[in-house]
């Protein structure tokens, strides 16, 4: 794959210069001012959100701060469609804020501010002269994970080698759908090499930092979106998820994220390596939204499915969105048992307990599910990782083919079950191994289907991960998200509370591979979160339950963690 005419470092540096040149000069802050914004006093990373870095920067006007902080995406659409706000001023506001996010957290890849603002002007003119909207997303700025192809822009997915290849001359299926719905695309966001680690770093764009605490990971693989949305540099972001890549950055960055059932949101036409994931048997990757409210997750899903996505991507099933209304029904919620091989860090365990208490006090029925080896998280993780071992090449092959070194989070990700702890003997031929593994996967699915059925569950309440955001390159194995990809169940993250070095000091480290260390001082103040899961193709029920749960825990004293 790699050419040898130009050193990869030179190519990467040249592209970073092009990226910087795409930002208006007046939006670039002097290095001394940037260092001042990063210096928040305690020596444990920069608390960019808590220290109000945006306000201190002076880059945005008061109106632009209101536009980017006060409104949901749904509210912005309402104001633009009534012409109370113009798409141009909304797009400029989010572009300026995204440019600051980039300077402080390295969350962006392809910068499309100029094109986005021009499209916003055209949409404003269309609405003014004809009175007609371009579509239900008319004028709304939307950010995209780098893997989504946008015509005329690179989709490197973090590989320098991809900069040597022709710039895409076509859009991914979802990009076409969003444009037809009237969206404004203004930036793409960072991810890791391989898109298979929980840290977002590569040799082109560097490492994305968490705006809550820059010494902690922003998560991965959609970490750029997580950081940008948390920084309020985007009203609505689009990521992808095959093992937790939407949900892990969401919980790390304190935002909402949703992984739909596969084949409901168009995924075709993305840039991918080493896994051509949308064509191989195994775990299906999915696209999904990331935002600062559940309302905006629902907005994305409703509008996407209303656009008849099966006409954009032949793999999408023809299932229109079902509107379940705004009711506050009482739920029956299964409380997932903690896998003893992967014990939760104290802040995660406390957030789950507080959420469960609030839900029970509000009259929801809780069913505490006992530990069962037929359906525990570790088994789901082992199934998932063995499927990945079949789907793609080993890391040595990846490094050789891309012609550049692996970043640390990828290099240290030696297969967590390489010692043979697989559900199926790894030395079988591939067809036999895949057949046997699918049998194990079916039994795992059956165990969970029976759990929902026998307990009459609406949803499951579970952790999103063993930990909160933790120091870079230490995340561990994402079994509490990967298991739901193995099952292809819709799942969403709700931010809830914060870690506390005073309340969360006790932890016994597990013996499981890649169990991350818990360091109370390092993660103090990091966002905590819970995960809600529904059965396959019950995406509408999952989001409805997320809305009910979110409202319940916000209205309770439990939020004061």
PLM-predicted stretches and their roles:
Residues 1-125, 361-363, 555-561:
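An N-terminal boundary/leader segment
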Residues 2-59, 280, 287, 292-319, ...:
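Acidic-enriched catalytic cores of C-N bond-cleaving enzymes acting on peptides and small amides
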Residues 54-60, 64, 138-160, 325-336, ...:
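Short helix-loop capping/hinge segments that flank enzyme active sites or metal/cofactor-binding pockets
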Residues 84, 101-163:
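N-terminal, positively charged, Ser/Thr/Ala/Gly-biased leader segments
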Residues 87-91, 121, 171-172, 346-372, ...:
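Acyltransferase
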Residues 100, 176, 180, 230-336, ...:
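Structural helix-boundary/capping segments
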Residues 136-287, 336-338, 460-477, 502:
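Short glycine/serine-rich loop/turn segments
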Residues 383, 464-482, 501-516:
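Short, surface-exposed loop/helix-turn segments at secondary-structure junctions
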